[in-house]
């Protein structure tokens, strides 16, 4: 996995602007500043004799622990010709060791650990979060692969195919291709200008000797940081760490002590825009300004500058570009790394807009900021957002450990984020103007334009019915759990009882349901909500209506315009977002504990009193049309749309998707009528988890939502039954300019209330629940190297959902991967699973469930959806026991009843795939 880690209040991915609110809400907030929270309180740093740095922090809010190993090596340590070798090695670290010649993903899965890894510019990191009794086992596995990884010819050849599949997946994205060109021009003499994952040309040439040498040079205790956060005792854990890791010697070939010759970041000589004219759907603009390294004193002011320019609807560039209708969206982030940094702005143009004009407005807006200055109000709002973001991001143990590891790896100081936040608090308006003048000079920037080279055309879709096979594919043997157990480190006995506290439940007189679960572990509140107003209610000729309603809720109410709504939330760093799903509209909210009234009052106002101003509604429609255009150029979006429409007939709720015509047909009166009909208190559920007094929150909800009145019965919708196809159906949607194919295989499934749900969950875990340890993962990804990722799902809801398998493959591997997957389905349908597979899958599901509930966001969603699905209130506690009680006969019966290998729909989107008859 590739990740871009940087010191920024915002991640380096696209930012959805969280709409927000103003003045008369100020009275709800205590203006007295709280004492700054130090996430590094109680962190202990230990240096072992072999040079290993150990960071430990006890957090006893849940019986869960996260173990992470960070290596101070990333793409920064590469050069042309070996670009991507750090990422390739990351993949190889899962292929087994001298002591454990087995895919490590299977070992982590057997522990029920949420484990993964990523490579970035300055580091490579491996992490696992599991129940606390698995702590020692995780330590043993990480120590083993620190020095005993097996890197051989056969394994490398297989994993190089996987990496190339991953890279080709990125190549499908015009944004990725444009960013690669812009970064290469911005850093022509530095490794930061190389793509983190490498290139296909370089990866294909990697030799076993090169990868082994890289491993010996950089994977050594004195180049590593071990981070442990969670429910453990520090003293005894450090003794265990010394026992396991302390005996590892430094590598004799280590390059850790070498003085690295750092290439200076020279001013680019590229003065005109880099223009890519390639197949695609939308025009894109990217701008990169070089910045100083992470330890430079200007970094806090640069972060505040970024928030003023791009964060929220009141920000300067959002107003100038998005609200004006020039752009569909704008995202930005400050990246601060060991040797330099950069500020990246990315803009998606609105239809029929000119990139030169957008670029001109962007430049003028930045120049005008210098000319007019920034206000103290803007600076304070940005500082509050940065601080709230830092606190909210650390609600989860894994994220907290990642912050510590990233800080220590990149800056040499695990306390860096606190120094950075202290710097942010000191930023003045003059500091913001100073960094704009210093770094955002027009002559310093690198600009890239993506201009689609052709008019968008519909995907060329071919449909083939298969009646016989002309190629037989022999799958490997199923994963043997006894082999996993053979190499699994001993697990400490469980010494705690899983008696999870249940939420308090209340129902208002108007039918609104409220679930409250206090949690004082962090001074934050997480809100998850649901309104039964999803896309299933879209008229076929006005598909997209439910989403347009949800997207416009915060565009104005009877008393507040959209800027006022945005301002109230942004000033406190409060997040509130609505998204229409097939079943229901989901509400996601988060705030610091003291700002909960702002969140609740804003939510009530927009849900009850939204007015859908015509100007903002039309702007959102244009954005929806642009997003549709981009979706129809995305193989994953095209594949899932074609897949659903190949299974479900017209007039079925799961068949309907927005089109340009359906979006154009929607009138303002349609939006108002839909909102009036489907947004009702008696179909609304709110779940809150966090630092609050339940009595006070209940009173607040009563006050804000109690007056919400509607008449009549709530609308109900029951999906009609859909027959299975009579034979295998194969569809290939060809998209110009794509190099990686996306495939979906499946058919109709079950609903959440189906008595087979728990057996189906266990069956799915064995079949494709994990891309490294499942049958599909072990065969298609690990043994054959045909895909970067393959998963299966039973997507359930109040109504029957869909069973599907998804994978991404190179076009030359697609047919073989489909054939292999089909054979695995036939095998498990006909012969079932083994008792040892059953027990391993149940343990994995139970452990993953317990780990997920340590994350407040996951906990709030689980509480919410249990209520939405009409499950018993004790489901939060009893889920694990129900999984534990699933029998072998129940799983094998589910395999016979729910897997239909000879009645499957197979859809592939992306490059043309040879339609050879590989499945029957």
PLM feature spans:
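Short, conserved secondary-structure transition motifs
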Residues: 164-170, 265-277, 382-393, 591-592, ...
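Extracellular/periplasmic catalytic domains that process cell-envelope and extracellular macromolecules
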Residues: 39, 47-49, 60-63, 119, ...
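Bacterial N-terminal signal peptides
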Residues: 1-6
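Non-catalytic, conformational "gating/processing" segments within enzyme and secreted inhibitor domains
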Residues: 160, 212-243, 444-445, 672-704, ...
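M16 family metallopeptidases and their MPP-like homologs
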Residues: 62-75, 84-88, 102-145, 177-201, ...
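Histidine-acidic residue clusters that define the catalytic metal-binding segment
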Residues: 28-44, 141, 166, 185-224, ...
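Proteolytic maturation boundary segments
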Residues: 7-55, 233-277, 319, 418-531, ...
């Amino acid at each position: 996995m590739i990740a871009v880690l940087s010191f920024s209040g915002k991640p380096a991915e696209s930012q959805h602007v969280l709409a927000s609110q103003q003045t008369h809400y100020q009275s709800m907030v205590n203006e007295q500043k709280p004492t700054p929270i130090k996430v590094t309180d109680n962190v202990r740093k230990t240096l072992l004799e072999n040079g290993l740095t150990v960071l430990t922090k006890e957090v006893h809010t849940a019986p869960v622990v996260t173990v992470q190993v960070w290596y101070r090596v990333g793409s920064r340590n590469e050069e042309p010709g070996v670009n991507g070798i750090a990422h390739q090695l990351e993949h190889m670290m899962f292929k087994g060791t001298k002591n454990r010649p087995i895919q490590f993903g299977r070992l982590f899965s057997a522990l029920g650990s949420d484990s993964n890894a990523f490579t970035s510019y300055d580091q490579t990191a491996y992490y696992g979060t599991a129940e606390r009794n698995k702590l020692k086992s995780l330590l043993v596995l990480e120590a083993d692969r620190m020095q005993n990884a097996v890197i051989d010819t056969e394994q490398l050849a297989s994993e190089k195919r996987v990496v190339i599949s991953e890279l080709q997946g990125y190549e499908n994205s015009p944004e990725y291709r444009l960013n690669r060109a812009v970064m290469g021009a911005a850093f022509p003499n530095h490794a930061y200008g190389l793509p983190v994952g490498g290139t296909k040309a370089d990866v294909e040439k990697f030799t076993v000797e090169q990868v082994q040498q890289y491993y010996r040079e950089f994977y050594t205790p004195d180049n590593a940081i071990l981070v442990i956060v969670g429910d453990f005792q520090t003293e005894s854990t450090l003794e265990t760490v010394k026992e396991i890791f302390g005996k590892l010697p430094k590598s004799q070939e280590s390059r850790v002590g070498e003085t690295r010759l750092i290439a200076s970041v020279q001013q680019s000589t590229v003065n005109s825009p880099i223009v890519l004219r390639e197949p695609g759907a939308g025009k894109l603009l990217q701008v990169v300004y070089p910045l100083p390294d992470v330890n430079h004193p200007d970094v806090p002011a640069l972060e505040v500058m970024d928030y003023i320019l791009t964060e929220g609807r009141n920000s300067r560039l959002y107003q100038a570009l998005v609200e004006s209708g020039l752009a569909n969206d704008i995202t930005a982030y400050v990246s601060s790394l060991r040797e330099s940094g950069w500020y990246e702005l990315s803009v998606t143009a609105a239809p029929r807009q000119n990139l030169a004009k957008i670029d001109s407005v962007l430049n003028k807006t930045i120049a005008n900021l210098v000319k007019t200055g920034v206000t103290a109000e803007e600076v304070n709002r940005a500082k509050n957002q940065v601080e709230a973001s830092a606190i909210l991001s650390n609600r989860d143990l894994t994220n907290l450990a990642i912050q510590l590891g990233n800080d220590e790896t990149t800056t040499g100081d695990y306390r860096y984020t606190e120094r950075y936040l202290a710097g942010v608090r000191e930023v003045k308006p003059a500091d913001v103007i100073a960094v704009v003048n210093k770094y955002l000079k027009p002559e310093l920037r690198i600009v890239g334009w993506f201009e689609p080279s052709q008019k968008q055309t519909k995907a060329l879709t071919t449909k083939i019915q298969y009646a016989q096979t002309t190629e037989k594919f022999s799958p490997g043997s199923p994963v043997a759990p006894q082999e996993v157990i053979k190499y699994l480190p001993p697990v400490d006995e469980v010494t705690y009882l899983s008696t999870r506290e249940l939420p308090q439940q209340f129902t208002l007189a108007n039918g609104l349901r409220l679930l409250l679960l206090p949690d004082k572990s962090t001074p934050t509140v997480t809100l998850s909500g649901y309104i039964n107003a999803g896309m299933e209610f879209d008229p076929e000729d006005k598909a997209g209506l439910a989403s347009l309603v949800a997207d416009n809720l915060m565009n104005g109410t009877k008393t507040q315009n959209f800027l006022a709504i945005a301002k109230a939330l942004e000033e406190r760093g409060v997040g509130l977002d609505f998204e229409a799903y097939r079943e229901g509209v989901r509400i996601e909210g988060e705030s610091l504990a003291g700002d909960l009234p702002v969140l609740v009052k804003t939510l009530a106002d927009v849900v009850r009193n939204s007015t859908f101003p015509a100007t903002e509604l039309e702007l959102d429609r244009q954005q929806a049309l642009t997003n549709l255009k981009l979706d129809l150029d995305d193989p994953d979006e095209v594949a899932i749309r074609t897949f659903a429409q190949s299974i479900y007939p017209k007039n079925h709720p799961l068949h309907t998707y927005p089109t340009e015509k359906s979006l154009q047909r929607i009138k303002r009166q349609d939006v108002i009528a839909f909102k009036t009909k489907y947004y009702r208190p008696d179909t609304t559920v709110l779940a809150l988890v966090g630092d609050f007094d339940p009595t006070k929150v209940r009173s607040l909800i009563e006050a804000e939502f109690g007056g919400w009145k509607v008449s009549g019965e709530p609308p109900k919708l029951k999906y009609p039954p859909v027959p299975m196809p009579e034979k295998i159906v194969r569809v290939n949607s060809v998209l110009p300019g794509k190099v990686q194919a996306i495939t979906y295989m499946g058919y109709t499934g079950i609903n959440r209330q189906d008595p087979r749900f728990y057996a189906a969950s266990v069956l799915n875990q064995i079949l494709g629940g994990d891309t490294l340890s499942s049958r599909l993962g072990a065969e298609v990804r690990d043994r054959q190297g045909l895909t970067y990722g393959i998963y299966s799902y039973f997507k359930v809801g109040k109504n029957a959902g869909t069973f599907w398998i998804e994978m991404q493959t190179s076009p030359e591997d697609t047919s073989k991967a489909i054939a292999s997957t089909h054979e695995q389905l036939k095998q498990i349908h006909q012969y079932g699973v083994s008792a040892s597979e059953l027990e391993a899958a149940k343990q994995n599901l139970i452990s993953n469930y317990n780990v997920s509930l340590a994350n407040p966001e996951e906990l709030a969603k689980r509480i919410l959806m249990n209520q939405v699905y009409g499950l018993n209130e004790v489901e939060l506690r009893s889920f694990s026991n129900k999984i534990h009680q699933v029998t072998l006969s129940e799983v094998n019966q589910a395999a016979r009843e729910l897997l239909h290998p000879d009645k499957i729909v197979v859809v592939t989107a992306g490059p043309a795939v040879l339609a050879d008859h590989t499945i029957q």
